[in-house]
Every structure is written in structure tokens, then in C-alpha cells.
């Protein structure tokens, strides 16, 4: 994942949101969850930082809502 692609995904999340603040909070909350998952050993070692992983996950959820459970 290069920085340009990550920036585009982040911009897309903000652009498609109705509330930029809540989107930023969602990214931060997801990153915090991923960070604790890393500490708990639930995720394999990765070079992708938690904030980057959160942006990727939320962007994928936005672009492909059929991936969401339920």
C-alpha cells in the first residue's frame, strides 16, 4: 500500500461522509482497536500501522458494503 493510495482512500472517506468529525473519530477508534489487537497477539505482525489499517478497512467497507456481515 503506497502513500498516494492511502491518501486517496482517506480523502474518499471524508468526501463521502456527512460529518467529517465523526469519520475522523471512527478512524481513530478503529485504529485504537487494531493497536490493542496487535498487543493481544490477535493479528500477525504487520508493517502497516494501525491508522493505515483502519483507513483501508473503513474504505473497503464504504466501497464494498456487501462485505459487511449480517
Curated annotation (Swiss-Prot):
Entry GO terms, CC: DNA-directed RNA polymerase complex
What gene codes for this chain? rpoZ
- Please give the subunit comment from the record: In cyanobacteria the RNAP catalytic core is composed of 2 alpha, 1 beta, 1 beta', 1 gamma and 1 omega subunit. When a sigma factor is associated with the core the holoenzyme is formed, which can initiate transcription.
One GO term under biological process is: DNA-templated transcription
Query: Could you tell me what this protein does?
Result: Promotes RNA polymerase assembly. Latches the N- and C-terminal regions of the beta' subunit thereby facilitating its interaction with the beta and alpha subunits.
Q: List S-S links within the chain.
A: none
The protein here is known as DNA-directed RNA polymerase subunit omega
Enumerate the InterPro entries for this protein.
Answer: DNA-dir_RNA_pol_omega, Pol_omega/Rpo6/RPB6
Which enzyme type, at the first EC level? Answer: transferase
Molecular function GO labels: DNA binding; DNA-directed RNA polymerase activity
What's its EC?
A: 2.7.7.6
**Member of which family?**
Belongs to the RNA polymerase subunit omega family.
Q: Show the catalytic activity.
A: RNA(n) + a ribonucleoside 5'-triphosphate = RNA(n+1) + diphosphate
Q: Which UniProt keywords apply?
A: DNA-directed RNA polymerase, Nucleotidyltransferase, Transcription, Transferase
